[in-house]
Amino acid sequence: MKLVTPTADLHASWLAANAEWGGEHQDGAATHLARGLDLTDPVDFATWVEMLNDDSVAATNHWMVEDGEYLGAIQLRHTIDSPALADLFGHIGYGVRPSARGRGLARQALREVLTDAREIGLHRVLVCCREDNAASISVIRACGGVLENIRHVDEFSLSHGVSTPTCRFWIETAS
């Protein structure tokens, strides 16, 4: 598996992965940037990919790809300067398509992105996941994550689409 810059060339594979998620939100894929776009349309998809690669956005997006197949996404947010990022989402978000899970892809991607975080001057990063996501908790801990707390559901979290308790882990990026 390699982390690559998002590309419109993977449209068909991305659509297949999206279907595995039921056409819903994909963690780490920054689909929120596509509001108003039809990602099944190649032109709209290419527009969204350009947004992902826009240097003016304070985030770095990578796609997990193997043999030309889209397997998932991981996003490194350079700052967590909003209450939602600081409390619920953190510096790094990721997701692996259901058919590719259990192969260590998330762990590999997170380790690589931790190096990127260190290179841009982040000495530690916040990584959050749902309390009921045992696989993600295992990935985060395997990469050095230390649980700070579990944020319980309230009006603020619900207003940001988070309806389950959120585990908040810090990971030191220094080697």
Predicted features and spans:
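Short secondary-structure boundary/hinge segments and terminal tails
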Residues: 118, 135, 157-159
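Conserved GNAT acetyl-CoA-binding A-motif
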Residues: 117-128
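Proline- and acidic/polar-enriched loop/turn elements at helix boundaries
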Residues: 112, 129, 152-153
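Conserved acetyl-CoA-binding loop-helix of GNAT-fold acetyltransferases
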Residues: 93-96, 102-119, 137-142
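Conserved beta-strand-loop-alpha-helix junction that forms the acyl-donor binding cleft
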Residues: 127-137
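Conserved G/P- and acidic residue-centered "switch" motifs that form tight phosphate/ATP-binding loops
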Residues: 68, 104, 121, 133
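GNAT-family acyltransferases
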Residues: 1-91, 95-98, 116, 153, ...
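Conserved acetyl-CoA-binding loop of GNAT-fold acetyltransferases
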Residues: 141-151
